């Protein structure tokens, strides 16, 4: 169902990152009411740039590390909801690419996303009298087919796709819809230099970047298009400047 971002309130976790910042720039062009950015490190220059792009949009920043206990996330969300009353969209975008850091990769890329999602359900779940909401989770094309030299990173992204697809199926119960946007290799600092698991391929970044990649702006433009298309359960591939809905094959069914 098509969705207009005009006058909406959006929370963007990691909205100042490589793809995140360019996506934030595209979002403010859509005349949001509020863009609330949650990120680990404040970037006043980037916040000022976002405000300058569209002064009609209120842009606010809160420091947030997705690896904090879920109670801290809930406390922060209470502050945000008290200020805005309603939130329409949550974008979960935190991610690291470093297979030396196994525990942190899982904590940031998957556990943090699950916890942030779980926390906002306290405010959105229609079983608790909530209004529902929209969750946009950033996965990766490696969630479809791994970069096998970084199996930890790729595994977390596969988990994001599976978790989000489950959320989408739960929408009739919770009132919360969900979909993933899954970028291909994108020109950001994330991929300039990173470590493979157990150092199985020391040149993994260089080899990857030898192939065609997309700009973060091209990715951001399609990212916002996916938000506007607002298809519950969609698995979007954002690769080489294109936006494509992935058809997921079913190989097993729980039957429940």
Swiss-Prot record:
GO terms for cellular component: cytosol. Disulfide bonds: none annotated. It comes from the Eukaryota. It catalyses: a primary alcohol + NAD(+) = an aldehyde + NADH + H(+); a secondary alcohol + NAD(+) = a ketone + NADH + H(+). Its EC number is 1.1.1.1. NAD(+) binds at residues 12-35. It is an enzyme of class 1 (oxidoreductase). The active site is at residue 153. GO terms for biological process: alcohol metabolic process. Belongs to the short-chain dehydrogenases/reductases (SDR) family. PANTHER family: ALCOHOL DEHYDROGENASE. Homodimer. This is Alcohol dehydrogenase. It comes from Drosophila orena (Fruit fly). The lineage of its organism: Eukaryota, Metazoa, Ecdysozoa, Arthropoda, Hexapoda.
């Amino acid at each position: 169902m098509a969705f207009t971002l005009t006058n909406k309130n959006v929370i963007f976790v990691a909205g100042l990152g490589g793809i995140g910042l360019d996506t934030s720039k595209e979002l403010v062009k859509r005349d949001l009411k509020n863009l609330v950015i949650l990120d680990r490190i404040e970037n006043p220059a980037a916040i000022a740039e976002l405000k300058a792009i569209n002064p009609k949009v209120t842009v606010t920043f809160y420091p947030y590390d997705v690896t904090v206990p879920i109670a801290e996330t809930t406390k922060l969300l209470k502050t945000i909801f008290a200020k805005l009353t309603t939130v329409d969209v949550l974008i979960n975008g935190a991610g690291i690419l470093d297979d030396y850091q196994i525990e942190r990769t899982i904590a940031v890329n998957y556990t943090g996303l699950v916890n942030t999602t779980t926390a906002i359900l306290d405010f959105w779940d229609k079983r608790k009298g909530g209004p529902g909401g929209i969750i946009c989770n950033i996965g990766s094309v490696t969630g479809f087919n791994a970069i096998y030299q970084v199996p930890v990173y790729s595994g977390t992204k596969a988990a994001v796709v599976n978790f989000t697809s489950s959320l989408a199926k739960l929408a009739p119960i919770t009132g919360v819809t969900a979909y993933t946007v899954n970028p291909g290799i994108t020109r950001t600092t994330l991929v300039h230099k990173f470590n493979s698991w157990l150092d199985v391929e020391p040149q993994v970044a260089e080899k990857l970047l030898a192939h065609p990649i997309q700009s973060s702006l091209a990715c951001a433009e399609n990212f916002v298009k996916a938000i506007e298309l607002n298809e519950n359960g969609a698995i979007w591939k954002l690769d080489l400047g294109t936006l494509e809905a992935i058809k997921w094959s079913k190989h097993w069914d729980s039957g429940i």
